[in-house]
């Protein structure tokens, strides 16, 4: 059974991973990536364009499926840990209409085996509009 994940990262980090075929979450910590398996769905939410900036982007920036997940997290030049992934290769940028600042971090699986939804870093104060 596939799981579905919401990953939170700046748009710049999502773009780098998409271009180079890997994903990164939680400031490069490996533990969350060990839980991601081939076939899992990934949606990236970016509260900012660049890490540390407060530009209020608040957009879903990529969507896709993990292609390679059996290998352990790997080291990347610009990140502590990442996982080879096709999550960004077939994704496209999704934008929202309004903007305000929201916190970052890794979120728990969406629609997991238990069917529960847990989102540790969701910002309920500013709704997002997704264009598909």
From Swiss-Prot:
InterPro entries: EVE_domain, PUA-like_sf, UPF0310
Organism taxonomic ancestry: Bacteria, Pseudomonadati, Pseudomonadota, Alphaproteobacteria, Hyphomicrobiales
CDD domains: EVE-like
This protein's name: UPF0310 protein msl8638
Family: Belongs to the UPF0310 family.
Annotated HAMAP family: UPF0310 (MF_00771)
């Amino acid at each position: 059974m596939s799981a579905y994940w919401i990953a939170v990262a700046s748009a710049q980090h999502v773009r780098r991973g998409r271009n180079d075929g890997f994903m990164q979450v939680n400031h490069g910590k490996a533990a969350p990536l060990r839980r991601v398996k081939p076939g899992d769905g990934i949606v990236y939410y970016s509260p900012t364009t660049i890490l540390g900036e407060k530009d209020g982007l608040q957009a879903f920036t990529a969507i896709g499926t993990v292609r390679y997940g059996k290998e352990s997290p790997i080291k990347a030049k610009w990140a502590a840990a990442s996982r080879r992934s096709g999550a960004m290769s077939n994704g496209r940028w999704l934008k929202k209409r309004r903007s305000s600042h929201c916190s970052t971090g890794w979120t728990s699986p969406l629609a997991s085996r238990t069917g529960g939804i847990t989102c540790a870093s969701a910002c309920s104060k500013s709704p997002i509009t997704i264009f598909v």
